[in-house]
Swiss-Prot record:
BP GO terms, sorted: proton motive force-driven mitochondrial ATP synthesis
Family statement: Belongs to the ATPase alpha/beta chains family.
Keyword terms of this UniProt record: ATP synthesis, ATP-binding, CF(1), Chloroplast, Hydrogen ion transport, Ion transport, Membrane, Nucleotide-binding, Plastid, Thylakoid, Translocase, Transport
UniProt protein name: ATP synthase subunit beta, chloroplastic
Subunit structure: F-type ATPases have 2 components, CF(1) - the catalytic core - and CF(0) - the membrane proton channel. CF(1) has five subunits: alpha(3), beta(3), gamma(1), delta(1), epsilon(1). CF(0) has four main subunits: a(1), b(1), b'(1) and c(9-12).
UniProt keyword tRNA processing present: no
Membrane topology category: Peripheral membrane protein
PROSITE patterns xrefs: ATPASE_ALPHA_BETA
Major localization listed first in the record, in broad terms: plastid
A cellular-component GO term for this protein: mitochondrion
Amino acid sequence: MVDVASKTGIISQIIGPVVDVEFSSGDLPKVYNAIVIDAGDKKVTCEVQQLLGNNKVRAVSMTSTDGLKRGASVLDTGSPITVPVGVPTLGRIFNVLGEPVDELGPCNAESGLPIHRPAPSFTELETKPSVFETGIKVVDLLAPYKRGGKIGLFGGAGVGKTVLIMELINNIAKAHGGVSVFGGVGERTREGNDLYAEMKESKVIDEDKLENSKVALVYGQMNEPPGARMRVGLTALTMAEYFRDVNKQDVLLFIDHIFRFVQAGSEVSALLGSMPSAVGYQPTLATEMGVLQERITSTNEGSITSIQAVYVPADDLTDPAPATTFAHLDATTVLSRGLASKGIYPAVDPLDSTSTMLQPEIVGTEHYATAQRIKETLQRYKELQDIIAILGLDELSEDDRLTVSRARKVERFLSQPFFVAEVFTGSPGKYVSLNDSIDGFNRLLNGEFDDLPEQSFYLVGDINEAIAKAAKLKG
């Protein structure tokens, strides 16, 4: 038992979100412990960051410090911030402290876990790389995800990032019996609200039976103090770890936005008086990123596959924030505005998206060869587009005309109707297995369907649907 009397202190200084607390005895709280300030009408939780000597600690607040004053009473909880975990978290929205913020009453979770935990030991890790099938053709075929890997999601506003995220949440639940945790790190409150509304509409969150929902949401939005934005990723990760380690499930962890996590760490670092590093970032940037990323992995029990939205400041890939993130990524999914404007969804760029899994030793020679042929065909089409724009299709050689024809079919066949978009499009969603994708594209590139019209390949699932659609168009 913690001797509460010896674990109380008083505020000696407040500088914005940073609070210095003096403890009367030498019994100081540990670094990363949560301490609670009693401000009369509200309780403010802070996290201890530094031990200053002379019985003083420096802590960073997780909520606003408005209304706090020197001399206010502070209690050490004896442990890091502890958040609820398990099935009761599904369908709910939490803040960094694990408190529900969706006005649906308390979360009746039986257990809680501290947000600061060690990464799985080396002996617990799964060492054989395996592909995580998503049911989305363009992803599985050209930039496959690693089970327990980290994927960077690049894309501006309005190119379909949210819909892709929701489809992945839906597919992991159906195909893998898994769940998802969404960590909104320093994003707009409006976006968080829109995502919640869209998830309810597409039944990713089941309002009638919350336990049937497929996702738990954790938000630390951009109006919150830097301490909350810095730790909300760990709160989401802790909830995901429980599903992996205790429920032995495959989990998808979305972090939107990993850059805001770095940005919040930079703010906290400056507030704590650390000497800034390159471009003004915190000197501990690589360590902070490593602590978060090393906990995202596959174990012998289950896996956490993480999809992280990556913002590139001023499109500078050498900026320390994206550069540090890239070191941890296994795959990148790049969304293209050009494809979105053509109406090809998901607007994943087949030439810019990459994956370390796309090796013949891992995915097999047939998959690898098919992916390379698709990329070569699309690359040739891209090179010919300038000539087509100036001189027209008729000026191309017979071979090039055939390449262009097949490339346009490939481009359209990479589109796919989504389950979560059924509400908007009216066409039923499709989950396409990897084997069906490989078979379909192989036959297409071998010239088996050169006589079928382009539009028969647009927004269909497997190749048989394209054949049926072509027959319907002719009929």
